[in-house]
Amino acid sequence: MTDGDILDLKPDLPDFRKEILKGLQSPSKWIHPKFFYDTNGSLLFDKITELPEYYQTRTENSLLIEKCESLSILLKDIESAVELGAGNGQKSFSLIKCLPGLKEYSLLDISISSLKGAVDYLKTAYPHIEIHGVCTDYLNPETMYMGDSTGKILIVFLGSTIGNMEKRDSINFLTSCNESMSRGDAILIGVDMKKDKAVLESAYNDSSGITARFNLNLIERIKREFCVSIPDGTFVHKAFYNEDIGRIEMHLVCTRDFSMTLDGAIIRFFKGEEIHTENSYKYTPDEFTEMLSIAGFPNPERLTDTRGYYSIFIARKP
């Protein structure tokens, strides 16, 4: 690829109508969290990352800055980096400073519009590094792009996105990454740690109500794309920490008996019925270290903040 190029692998986009019908016709109703991120949802999530209660983005970026010297030692031989779910490139900007031998940085994302902005931003900031964008389903190992470098490669997976996967899926994903790597290549992952329940629940129930709007935007999208009427207040936001499973759960709760017709199918809700919209798993250091080991990454390094809220794990393929 030429420096500054964007390679569009034309990923298969999910069928919103089909998957919404499937989820809402299930005995326990659900909507996949990938549908949060339409244009309005993406804007709302950007606002979430700036909220005082939402420590994850702020803490991760602080770690990349404060632990840059440690990262530069651990990753001094890395020549090429591939970031999965790069978004707007803000995380990339901080990390690139910590990779002294870097020659090439590839950003992978399913949104080509996000990639264009991120590539332009990083190319201006780092003109001496080859910056590429790849529009692809970065969670699909069959379309994983590993760059053009013949040197050591780093896979980057920040934003605690690994927590949105079920544990078994996380291990399978990490195993797929391992299988695409060569000996000595590295992986860097941002992971949200288990902590006080009140801190966790506050992060998903902010006082400004932005997270509630983000969750309820799914209802707005259903109204718009199915041309259906759903009165305001029919659903409310709910988020809580399930201590038994170790995850934040987000739901939409129906406030009254209600029915609607979607593509000819009658969808009925009873008062108090919930639509499960997202999980976000939290881990202890030992739990995530074990997951990495199972996936073929033994003895990872871990960098964390003083409170132990968030960790960056770095591991090599032996």
Tell where the protein language model's regions lie, with residue ranges.
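N-terminal auxiliary segments of SAM/dcSAM-dependent transferases
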Residues: 1-34, 42
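Class I SAM-dependent methyltransferase Rossmann-like catalytic core
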Residues: 29-75
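Conserved class I S-adenosyl-L-methionine
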Residues: 77-87
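Conserved SAM-binding loop of SAM-dependent methyltransferases across substrates and taxa
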Residues: 88-101
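Conserved SAM/SAH-binding beta-strand->alpha-helix loop
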Residues: 108-112
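A short glycine-rich, Lys/Arg-flanked "PGG" loop and its adjoining helix->strand segment in the class I
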Residues: 171-183
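Conserved beta-strand signature within the Rossmann-like core of class I S-adenosyl-L-methionine
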Residues: 180-194
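Substrate-binding/catalytic lobe of Class I Rossmann-like enzymes that use SAM or dcSAM, i.e.
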Residues: 201-281, 285, 289-295
